[in-house]
Amino acid sequence: MIGMPPPHFSLERQILSYYESGQEAERLESPFFRWEKVRTLDLLERLLPPAPALILDVGGAAGAYAFPLAEKGYVVDLIDPVPSHIEQAQKRAAMGQRVPRSFHVGDARAIPCDNGVADAVLFFGPLYHLTDSGERMKAICEARRVLRAGGVLLAVAISRFASALDGITRGLIRDPDFVRIVQQDLKTGQHRNETGNLDYFTTAFFHHPDELKTELIEGGFPNPRLCAIEGPLWALPESATAEQQEGFMAIMRKLENEVTLIGASAHIMGIATKPND
């Protein structure tokens, strides 16, 4: 149950400007990034409890995953800190039938929901846009609060090595300004783009895989496991037949839990279950 409006939190200006520009919707539909969405949907199908479980999609943008889940019979509450994302989702919902139950402007650090009601919480954004570790811990503890015992948190991080690998794959590494961004990413995990080039992303924190696991444990989720989302698939050519794509997916399912390869994935999913207290 969605409750009273939470305390006010604000996104950093650069992050809000990036998403208000419509970059996220365009990115997920672009050929180069398609594997992120395809693989995420594949993982959700395998990791979520059966419908009609209640899912809180926190930081879910305009509903890239909330709508497909609602179509499968899940009860989905979509929460995002970017007002235009919620407006886009509401417009889309007006044209559909099986759509998310509710849409709210809100923040992962103060989820507008009662204690212990959610079967699953999706964090597909909050952990990399909360650049301070204390703020990330607030969000993780909030996820634990709203989950029922046995509920699952699926929390996505961007890999510490994502910019370096992206730069090599797409040739961005030829730009000295991009090289400087990569150097800071590798040193501190703090991704800062002062170039004005939106292709270089926006303000974020890039996790080392071990950091993601540690944060989940410290937030009250014992024994989390990590899973590579795209893995090496993001380096594949843009065109592939349906048969080839299925072959790629079968390989990735074999590689997704390989510890030595998880950091080579642009996105890493932390899978954590709330214990019985």
Kindly give the residue locations of the regions a language model identified.
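C-terminal lobe and adjacent flexible extensions of AdoMet/dcAdoMet transferase-like proteins
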Residues: 215, 219-277
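Class I SAM-dependent methyltransferase SAM/SAH-binding core
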Residues: 56, 64-110
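A short SAM/SAH-binding and catalytic strip from SAM-dependent methyltransferases
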Residues: 119-134
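A short acidic, Gly/Pro-enriched loop at the edge of an enzyme's catalytic core
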Residues: 109-121
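Acceptor-substrate binding/catalytic loop of class I
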Residues: 130, 196-210
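A short glycine-rich, Lys/Arg-flanked "PGG" loop and its adjoining helix->strand segment in the class I
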Residues: 137-149
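Conserved class I S-adenosyl-L-methionine
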Residues: 2-51, 64, 68, 96, 152-185
